[in-house]
């Protein structure tokens, strides 16, 4: 009797030079240090993340540099595991724009796995995740689309936690303002 192991990988690895050319075409290469460009390329390559599919982004605002994984990437990896049985995300509460810390807007994700007896439930609160400008007011996205933004945080965190084997080690998603973020 022979045992065969078949490995399936649908990683669409983008060649390093194409990623570098893309950074240049998006005018990001001139904003990033050589070390930041190399870090971005290494992470994209190591995890099979394709910037052309918007699976990974680079964000540079002032001297701050972040590598951001799109929340859809976590969902795709959960689906590919064959263990995802369903999910839903809902919001409750309201926003007090005069005192954001008093807001009780919450997004809750419920994820069902085929190999678990109980659903995974995770909640995040607007007051804890709202991204602010230097003056303390919510940035454009969080001001204009607060429900969408808090749902995206719940989804990214929920799938990352519930499918840690599939998503472990990926850079954490961050919901930042397009005013301060350059997408790749």
Predicted regions mapped to residue ranges:
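Glycine-rich anion-binding surface patch
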Residues: 1-178, 182
């Amino acid at each position: 009797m022979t045992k065969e192991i078949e490995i399936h990988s649908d990683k669409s690895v983008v060649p390093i030079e194409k990623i570098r050319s893309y950074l240049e075409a998006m005018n990001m290469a001139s904003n990033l240090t050589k070390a930041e460009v190399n870090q971005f390329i290494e992470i994209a390559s190591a995890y099979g993340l394709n910037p052309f599919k918007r699976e990974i982004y680079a964000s540079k605002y002032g001297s701050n540099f972040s590598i951001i994984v799109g929340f859809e990437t976590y969902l795709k990896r959960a689906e590919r595991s064959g263990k995802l049985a369903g999910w839903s995300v809902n919001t409750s509460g309201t926003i007090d724009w005069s005192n954001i810390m008093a807001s009780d807007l919450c997004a809750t994700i419920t994820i069902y796995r085929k190999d678990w007896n109980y659903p995974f439930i995770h909640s995040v609160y607007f007051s804890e995740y709202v991204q602010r400008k230097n003056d303390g007011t919510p940035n454009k996205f969080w001001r204009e689309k607060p429900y969408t933004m808090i749902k995206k945080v719940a989804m990214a965190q929920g799938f990352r936690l519930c499918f840690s084997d599939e998503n472990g080690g990926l850079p954490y998603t961050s919901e930042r303002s397009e005013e301060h973020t350059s997408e790749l």
